[in-house]
A protein has these predicted regions:
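Transmembrane helical elements of multi-pass membrane transporters/channels
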Residues: 24-43, 145, 179, 208-212, ...
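Short alpha-helical transmembrane segments in multi-pass integral membrane proteins
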Residues: 1-26, 84-151, 193-248, 311-377, ...
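Short runs within selected transmembrane alpha-helices of multi-pass transporters and secretion channels
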Residues: 77, 146-164, 172-180, 201-214, ...
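Small-residue-rich hydrophobic transmembrane alpha-helices
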Residues: 56-116, 153-172, 265, 283-349, ...
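Transmembrane alpha-helix boundary and packing residues in multipass membrane permease domains
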Residues: 29, 33, 45, 49, ...
């Protein structure tokens, strides 16, 4: 069993080699993030092969709901995990207990509320997300079922972060993997075997999410830092605010990402309708590229989340040199991961698109063009999430929030609105790489200034 967090001297976060710690915590976090994307990618692949382009477009219009769920999970999960680690690093065990109990109840309450709201208002939600007349019936059949799984999705996504913070990254990975494997098996059974189409994909997703939820719940009966007792499980106003404070930057980033997705869908259908591709092909391709980009996000954000306990604990313990070493090595890993994925996207765009089903030559032409242009600068995209998570983990909420919102809100969203008016459909594609470069410059310049401050703190210790 992994050693529980007790004191800085005893805890491996304070004394173990940094490179090994990053690998130990980041690998399960990356796998967990990847598995979370598999819920959506698996459906997209099976739907593409059994339903076709309209089915792929339908999952794209439902995807902003998943982004919203992820945002709420990160608001609670990252905020709870960061406060838990900061409290344990400062030897404040009672405060850590309060954060854990509050975080568990918050994640359950938010999930139930979101699921009910989406189920009741699914038609206006889908129209807002860009569903065309052809796509809407498929999207309704899909979202009407997957809305019922949102409470389970939000709970296990949020609390897998707390499980990692408790020193059990492998178990957090198990929560995600168990559901993902079942999702793949049920997709094959329900769609290929029974021919249930969109409903089969949605049902497979919900059943898999329930399994991941049950595996996650099981862990809290043997929480390592301290026992979870019933009196801990209540919402406390002060703890809720502090959890929200440290999770806010990640949450708002997801909200902006959702807004960008909705804006992009509507721009693609509007300008696509006036092009040779029509409205439905760009909408379907955007769904595929969004899912592929989520693979990159899984690697980079998973790496950043894996570094978070090291950042938080050592800031609480005052180990500034160790914090700098963690960021340096995390940056190298982030750039290597981003470059590897960039090469795959640039070299094999058509082959990757074919994984998600067949289509006309126009469909594949647009998919190849979209992949190569929109994801042109993903080779540097790992820097921003690492830097955002760093500032969030050490409690610098304003800086983390500013950086978190920069790529999507400050740069990408305005570019998506402006460039298509000048360059048409191509303008929406080039907005992606331009925003990536601007966000990279902002993150590195901000970290450079903070690095000098860390050096002074290290020398004055």
């Amino acid at each position: 069993m992994t050693e529980s967090i007790v004191t800085p001297k005893e805890n491996p976060l304070a004394v173990a080699p940094v490179g090994g710690l990053i690998r130990r915590f980041a690998l399960p976090a990356i796998v967990s993030m990847l598995v979370n994307t598999i819920y959506n990618i698996t459906d997209q692949i099976f739907i593409g092969h059994t339903v076709g382009i309209l089915g792929n477009a339908a999952t794209n219009t439902a995807f902003p709901v998943v982004i919203l769920s992820t945002g709420l999970a990160q608001l609670v999960g990252i905020g709870t995990a960061a406060n838990f680690n900061l409290s344990m690093g400062a030897k404040a065990r009672d405060a850590a207990r309060s954060y854990v109990g509050t975080g568990l109840i918050m994640s359950a309450a938010f999930g139930i509320l979101l699921g009910c709201l989406i189920y009741m208002f699914q038609m206006p939600v889908l129209l807002l997300c860009g569903a065309t007349e052809n796509v809407l019936p498929y999207a309704q059949r899909y979202l009407g079922i997957t809305a019922c799984g949102l409470p389970f999705l939000l709970f296990f996504t949020a609390n897998s972060m707390l499980i990692r913070a408790d020193g059990a990254p492998s178990y957090a990975m198990r929560c995600m993997v168990s559901g993902a494997v079942l999702n793949i098996l049920l997709d094959a059974l329900f769609m290929l075997g029974f021919g249930w189409g969109m409903e089969g994909a949605a049902l497979a997703t919900v059943m898999a999410q329930i399994v991941s939820f049950l595996v996650c719940i099981r862990y809290f009966f043997r929480f390592q830092a301290f026992p979870i007792v019933r009196t801990m499980l209540r919402m406390r106003g002060r703890e809720m605010l502090r959890i929200a404070k440290l999770g806010l930057s990640n949450f708002l980033n997801q909200i902006i990402m959702m807004t960008v997705g909705i804006t992009l869908n509507n721009i693609l259908t509007h300008y696509g309708a006036a092009s040779v591709y029509g409205a439905d092909i760009p909408l379907a391709v955007a769904g595929i590229v969004t899912k592929l980009n989520s693979v990159l996000i899984a690697f980079t954000v998973g790496l950043a989340q894996g570094c978070q306990p090291i950042f938080s604990f050592n800031m609480g313990a005052g180990n500034y040199g160790r914090i700098k070493e963690t960021y340096r090595k995390g940056l190298v890993f982030a750039l290597l991961l981003s470059m590897a994925i960039f090469l795959v996207f640039q070299l094999f765009p058509r082959q990757i698109t074919a994984i998600f089903g067949g289509g006309s030559e126009l469909y594949f032409d647009f998919a190849e063009k979209y992949l190569r242009i929109y994801l042109m600068m993903v080779c540097i995209s790992g820097v921003q999430p690492l830097t955002v998570n760093y500032f969030t983990a050490i409690g610098s909420v304003r800086t983390g929030l500013m950086l978190s919102l920069s790529r999507q809100g400050l740069f990408l969203l305005p570019l998506l609105i402006l460039l298509p008016h000048i360059f048409g459909l191509d303008g929406a594609l080039y907005a992606g790489p331009i925003a990536e470069v601007l966000a990279f410059i902002l993150a590195m310049s901000t970290m450079y200034r903070h690095w000098q401050q860390l050096t002074r703190m290290e020398r004055g210790k």
